[in-house]
């Protein structure tokens, strides 16, 4: 009997110590403008440092346009929606208005996936984001990269 008890305790320790990396869908403007590519890359790096697995790494890829030129609209949609459905959370940079980012946010909320929207304090962010009462959506302004890193890290650790 004692051996069985030890085995159960040891299995519990393994489960606690094997906390898996959260899977994150990173969302940012692509066709709406790539002027924040450096910010997307910073967000990607911050997520990896925090122990997250970024499923939509292509958002931070400077060669994305070349890659997506070889894909149909349907292939891009299927890839992105497939990755979103595998995600534990969505983190979106919403400073640059983007129909695609808005669509991804909405789909995540419909699927009950937590969403963190980040934006520059001087951005004109849609009321559909800032006024959304869904408790799974958190919208936060970041004045600098240190604040951006802190907000992302705290969000990941809370998942």
Curated annotation (Swiss-Prot):
It holds the Pfam family Nuc_deoxyrib_tr. Catalyzes the cleavage of the N-glycosidic bond of deoxyribonucleoside 5'-monophosphates to yield deoxyribose 5-phosphate and a purine or pyrimidine base. GO terms for biological process: deoxyribonucleoside monophosphate catabolic process; nucleoside metabolic process; nucleotide metabolic process. GO terms for molecular function: 5-hydroxymethyl-dUMP N-hydrolase activity. It catalyses: a pyrimidine 2'-deoxyribonucleoside 5'-phosphate + H2O = a pyrimidine nucleobase + 2-deoxy-D-ribose 5-phosphate; a purine 2'-deoxyribonucleoside 5'-phosphate + H2O = a purine nucleobase + 2-deoxy-D-ribose 5-phosphate. Keywords: Glycosidase, Hydrolase, Nucleotide metabolism. InterPro entries: 2'-dNMP_N-hydrolase (IPR051239), DNPH1 (IPR028607), Nucleoside_deoxyribTrfase (IPR007710). Coiled coil: none annotated. Belongs to the 2'-deoxynucleoside 5'-phosphate N-hydrolase 1 family. Its EC number is 3.2.2.-. This is Putative 2'-deoxynucleoside 5'-phosphate N-hydrolase 1. Monomer and homodimer. Substrate binds at residues 25-31, 40, 58, 104, 126-128.
